[in-house]
Amino acid sequence: MTAFDSFLQKQRVRMAARFLAPGARVLDLGCGDGALFRQLTWISGIGIDPTLAHSFDLPNASVMAGRFPDDVPAERGFDAVTLLAVLEHLPVEVQRRLDEACARVLKPEGRVILTVPSAKTDLVLAVLKKFRLVHGMALEEHYGYDVRKTPELFGSFRMVAHERFQLGFNNLFVCEKP
């Protein structure tokens, strides 16, 4: 990860943090090295990522190799599920299962907090990757994701917020379970 990748990641975490209460139990999907839990030491939970070689523990979280929802423990009662720069990397058939899978693990009024890039982002990332300013992690996996479809993917949830950030190249969505 380049310094610029790290900067962008920290911005995504800061955007999500505004919607997480102190002490929140969070399930972080596509957690990578556990950056959300490393940055936000006042939350706890579980991180899961299919790219991890092995599972490990942080002071405030267990981070495990695996895929959601199949490999997540049968725990329920999370205050939030986060997908920061993850949704656009998921195949369409997995995206379609997220609403039900997230609802199953969340408390009533629990939140799905996610960031997804705008359509124009892929072109900019491709240029930045060419100049080695970003790694463009799995850029080829964006599946042509259309950010406008995000609300319908979480149709059983109430949309709480939609904000653009990073000069309009990124979007934050917050959906609440009824």
Model regions and ranges:
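Conserved class I S-adenosyl-L-methionine
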Residues: I113-V134
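Conserved N-terminal segment of class I S-adenosyl-L-methionine
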Residues: M1-R76, A80-T82, R96-D99, G136-K149, ...
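Short catalytic micro-motifs in class I SAM-dependent methyltransferases
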Residues: A85-H89
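Feature marks short, surface-exposed loop/turn motifs that line or immediately flank catalytic pockets
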Residues: H54, L90, K120-D122
